[in-house]
């Protein structure tokens, strides 16, 4: 049995066994477990499992185990459950000798009541933010892979222009790399539509069609569609993914209503046809123009804040981004990044936000130096620091800085310092969405590599100095504990 399989089975035991698990899924660093009864979860045992870097309680229990490991752990849990990742795990409650129906009903009612309270507590805004995260989390590997391949193509192009490399095969290679990159970015509206449909309860294929509708495929020359509000021609992709998400949300409402009123015998034919006609027309003539206005305004505001605020805006964004990652709300920026790239050719927000992770790396390096006697902490840092340099910060957040408290705050200050440098230099953007840290370098636009490196070094230094001077306690330096 591999260590990942052992970790998966220990996690299952700590959350109350397979009988207490409703479904399992994962993102880049977290195993996301939906349990039937929170009271059966042993939180302390879960947190102290070797390999678990942190635990977040939300609608799902999110167990941070780190990149790479998370896929193996989640897949093994799915194998043990007998279903695919994300699918509900069946539980046999038909045995009357083993089943106390009265207790089961009471427990179910209690669970539903707690879930309802949790939803009320979370509020509509948090629900919206989580929906956006659920739409884009499955796309993160594609963003990273396609973005880095596009970045490599850009670097090769720059080297050709500078005369360092040449040859027809290099040109062909660059073309192939760009085709692979565009396989993701050119059809992002379709991918977004499919995932949005899954999130809102619509048919995924119909969501993909609505996303594809915004691309205005086949519209060219005199055969154009007009913006009913401005009289100008509609542009392919106008309204961006913000328009797609809203349109698919409307699609989910229309489709559900149609399922209720259309007879079963013709439901499979009538419902998708009418749903696509209604929402397709609304998307082209209403949602695309309005969402286009919203997207343009949003990008203008963000660019204005970064441009006018400079050092100050950079510090605020860099310092506040780690708490957003901690809360899982950083995915709200994904639509903004994409719209900035579509309109400006680069997102000037991402390099500033990336400084948060660099500040945390600096803080972790200071802990490595200051806490030489704390072997538990240093062992955790051995696994979390390398991926931190590459822009994956959750293992450091949940495994190191957040449990210790002070280093989390000093890491935020380090991120703010790096963000201030990026904001002060200005015009440092990323051509695509990808990981932060050193891994973002190939994606930096307009050859502003040195400016980005300066920001990274400033964040490393700021996080290191602040943590070295103010981020540790005597207990951290002298004991073998990771936190209270």
Curated annotation (Swiss-Prot):
Spell out the CDD domains in the cross-references: PTS_IIB_glc
Pathway field? Cell wall biogenesis; peptidoglycan recycling
> What is the recorded name of this protein?
PTS system MurNAc-GlcNAc-specific EIIBC component
Q: Does the keyword Amino-acid biosynthesis apply?
A: no
Q: Which domain of life is it from?
A: Bacteria
Broad class of enzyme this protein falls into: transferase
Task: Return the EC number.
Answer: 2.7.1.-
